[in-house]
């Protein structure tokens, strides 16, 4: 053994070839600060081996290196800029030493090589991969850019266009694509990976392969003519501006850095990468996006822990076909759980099957599946008008009309047709589970399972624990949602649960703005362009359905009369009374017509202004800041109340439910991350300016306490130790 660290070791393999093996104590290898330091120490040993002829890098895990240790990021990002820059210089000196070894080097890559893992293998001369490879640089999705030389080496290896596509989008690609663009030199089966790697190294050692020529382009300026450079970077910047926008600075920074570094050799180019990375790491956007990644891991880990002793349902059923029922049935079947879809008439069943078939055909058109797979999936969806087969069902979700009487009748009838241990769930969006459970003989086997529309796209499923729901019931439904590829978040029961409970105060803020003379078009523009929502409130209401919102508004008002009971007729009432239900009937705040692809396209409709004038004061202008404050304060206050009341268990789960269920702008990180970023005291000062608008604007006492003591909602993060103690020598 030449060297043994905590996460890697170095040993002789054969005939002058050494192997450096990543072998962390846990289930995966991460390129954390300790591993970078250990790699430097291993290279120091290697550099003294006079009989060294070649080096093989490999992993003892199912994946090569999954990336940097993102749990370190928040503390690293708090380190002063100069110290973070010094540490990056040290880390890059390690990878440069790997690249500068006087012998050929090869990385044998199995499974994932992402982020720092990808940057590590870019420093070797050759790369062999297994067919299950996923390789790429996802840093821009975390609000940063490659910092271990990825923005320097990848363009010089692949050419500007291919590298820009991967880096700016934060993409990872598979083995076939990686081989095609030259990111790997060969693809071999797992069992032949090491033999293949040694064979390539031997060819390089004997001179049959010119490893020096392979290495040289990575050390030099990017080979691009002025015209090629202008085209590549202009197109890349245009695409990034269109897709990322101003709220996500990392992709544009990465493109501009690669452009600026193109005329330099490795050392100067790495300095430019460093100068761009460090300021990005200190942005609120980076902290928010890293926070989302960590929260996602926390939520998924919690679901995994909850279901560790539970068998995933093998047969499911959906009550109520149509678009929602068909979407749920498709998702279950697509992910491998056969499903019975029951309705009371053929028309609805046909609609549900048509929806499932449409979604499968889209997969076929995109080349994701073939005809055989399509037929196999659709054959596991069984439409029926009766309860045949329900005695074999493990879990049933009811997705009928949002009417408590109808839901209770359907659930009570179904309970008599299934086994005693079968779990029943309701896809209600607002009706308390306690109320629906009152119709059942086995309320302990019942809970809520709130999908979001469209089911195949929206990652969140709210799992609602009723007062009598058993732990096993919740675990079974969480297991099914996870199997469907969804992110289940368990919440406690109340009208609207979590997501809709916090959404309707936001809509109430919108209604009050319109009542006071705001133009809905400006409100939408500000909330989309300035705050960053994917849709403004008027457009969102049109998509949800004005009739749906009108009904849900009444349910929420009955549930929380002190805050959500209106004392005036609002825009939603006016549109509802005029039968303007939104996209579903072509008229809402906007008029809708189908575009060439059959999708609804919104157009101005002057008639709506006359309609809204009857429920609004004369038009007046509001500043962007005032619009954002009046829209967001009711939502933030309600989110905080939900945490204080135990409706949602943690800030992390609340923020992920908002991002995955409502499209809360990821660069803000969620409501609690947004609160922590600006500080509770600053938020309180802002909110108090609007408390005259009513109870929805009154800040909860718990938040006032946070403001008084300057306490964040997320646990405080300490800056990483000074760079000198990060094992940098």
From Swiss-Prot:
It comes from the Bacteria. NAD(+) binds at residues 324, 343, 400-402, 407, 429, 453. Substrate binds at residues 296, 500, 660. Residues 1-189 are annotated as: Enoyl-CoA hydratase/isomerase. GO terms for cellular component: fatty acid beta-oxidation multienzyme complex. Residues 311-729 are annotated as: 3-hydroxyacyl-CoA dehydrogenase. Pathway: Lipid metabolism; fatty acid beta-oxidation. Involved in the aerobic and anaerobic degradation of long-chain fatty acids via beta-oxidation cycle. Catalyzes the formation of 3-oxoacyl-CoA from enoyl-CoA via L-3-hydroxyacyl-CoA. It can also use D-3-hydroxyacyl-CoA and cis-3-enoyl-CoA as substrate. In the N-terminal section; belongs to the enoyl-CoA hydratase/isomerase family. In the C-terminal section; belongs to the 3-hydroxyacyl-CoA dehydrogenase family. HAMAP family: FadB. This is Fatty acid oxidation complex subunit alpha. The lineage of its organism: Bacteria, Pseudomonadati, Pseudomonadota, Gammaproteobacteria, Enterobacterales.
């Amino acid at each position: 053994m030449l060297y043994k660290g905590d996460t890697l070791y170095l040993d002789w393999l054969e005939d002058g070839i050494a192997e450096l093996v990543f072998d962390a104590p846990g289930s995966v290898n991460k390129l954390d600060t300790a591993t970078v330091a250990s790699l430097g120490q291993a290279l120091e040993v290697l550099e003294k081996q006079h009989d060294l002829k070649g080096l093989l890098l490999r992993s003892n895990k199912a994946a090569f290196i999954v990336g940097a240790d993102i749990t370190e990021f928040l503390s690293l990002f708090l380190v002063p800029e100069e110290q973070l820059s010094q540490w990056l210089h040290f880390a890059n000196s390690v990878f440069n030493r790997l690249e500068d070894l006087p012998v050929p080097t090869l990385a044998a890559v199995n499974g994932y090589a992402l982020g720092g893992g990808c940057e590590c293998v870019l420093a070797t001369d050759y790369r062999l991969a297994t067919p299950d490879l996923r390789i790429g640089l996802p840093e821009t999705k975390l609000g940063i850019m490659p910092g271990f030389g990825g923005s320097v080496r990848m363009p010089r290896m692949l050419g500007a266009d291919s590298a820009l596509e991967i880096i700016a989008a934060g993409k990872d690609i598979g083995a076939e694509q990686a081989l095609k663009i030259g990111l790997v030199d060969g693809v071999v089966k797992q069992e032949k990976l090491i033999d293949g790697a040694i064979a390539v190294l031997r060819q390089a050692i004997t001179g049959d392969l010119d490893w020096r020529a392979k290495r040289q382009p990575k050390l030099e300026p990017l080979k691009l003519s002025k015209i090629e450079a202008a085209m590549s970077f202009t197109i890349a910047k245009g695409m990034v501006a269109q897709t990322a926008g101003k709220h996500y600075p990392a992709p544009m920074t990465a493109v501009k850095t690669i452009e600026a570094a193109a005329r330099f050799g490795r050392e100067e180019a790495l300095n430019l990468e460093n100068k761009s990375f460090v300021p990005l790491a200190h942005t609120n956007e980076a902290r928010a996006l890293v926070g989302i990644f960590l929260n996602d891991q926390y939520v998924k880990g919690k679901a995994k822990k909850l279901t560790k002793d539970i068998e995933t349902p093998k047969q499911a059923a959906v009550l109520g076909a149509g678009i929602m029922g068909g979407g749920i049935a498709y998702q279950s079947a697509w992910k491998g759980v056969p499903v019975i879809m029951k309705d009371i008439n053929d028309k609805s069943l046909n609609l549900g099957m048509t929806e499932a078939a449409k979604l499968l055909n889209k997969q076929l058109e995109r080349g994701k599946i073939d005809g055989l797979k399509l037929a196999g999936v659709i054959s596991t969806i069984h439409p029926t008008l009766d309860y045949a087969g329900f005695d074999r069902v493990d879990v049933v979700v009811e997705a009928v009309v949002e009417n408590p009487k109808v839901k209770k009748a359907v659930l009570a009838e179904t309970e008599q047709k299934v086994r005693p241990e079968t779990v029943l769930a309701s896809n209600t969006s607002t009706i308390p589970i306690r109320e629906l459970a009152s119709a059942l003989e086995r309320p302990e086997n019942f809970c809520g399972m709130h999908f979001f529309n469209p089911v195949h796209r929206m990652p969140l499923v709210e799992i609602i624990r009723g007062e009598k729901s058993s732990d096993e019931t919740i675990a079974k439904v969480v297991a099914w949602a996870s199997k469907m590829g969804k992110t289940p978040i368990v919440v406690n029961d109340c009208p609207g649960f979590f997501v809709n409970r916090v959404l309707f105060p936001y809509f109430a803020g919108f209604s009050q703005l319109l009542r006071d003379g705001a133009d809905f078009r400006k409100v939408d523009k500000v909330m989309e362009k300035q705050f960053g929502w994917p849709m403004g409130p008027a457009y969102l209401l049109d998509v949800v359905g004005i009739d749906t919102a009108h009904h849900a508004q009444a349910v929420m008002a009955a549930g929380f009369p002190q805050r959500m009971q209106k004392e005036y007729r609002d825009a939603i009432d006016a549109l509802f009374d005029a039968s303007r239900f939104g996209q579903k009937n072509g008229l809402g705040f906007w008029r809708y017509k189908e575009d060439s692809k059959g999708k609804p396209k919104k157009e101005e409709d002057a008639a709506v202004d006359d309609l809204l004038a009857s429920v609004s004061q004369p038009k007046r202008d509001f500043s962007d800041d005032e619009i954002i404050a009046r829209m967001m304060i009711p939502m933030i206050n309600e989110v905080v109340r939900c945490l204080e009341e135990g409706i949602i268990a943690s800030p992390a789960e609340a923020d992920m439910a908002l991002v995955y269920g409502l499209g809360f702008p990821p660069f803000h990180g969620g409501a609690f991350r947004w609160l922590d970023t600006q500080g509770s005291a600053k938020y309180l000062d802002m909110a108090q300016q609007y408390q005259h608008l009513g109870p929805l604007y009154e800040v909860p006492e718990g938040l006032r306490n946070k403001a008084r003591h300057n306490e964040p909602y997320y646990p405080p993060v300490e800056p990483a130790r000074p760079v000198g103690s990060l094992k940098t020598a």
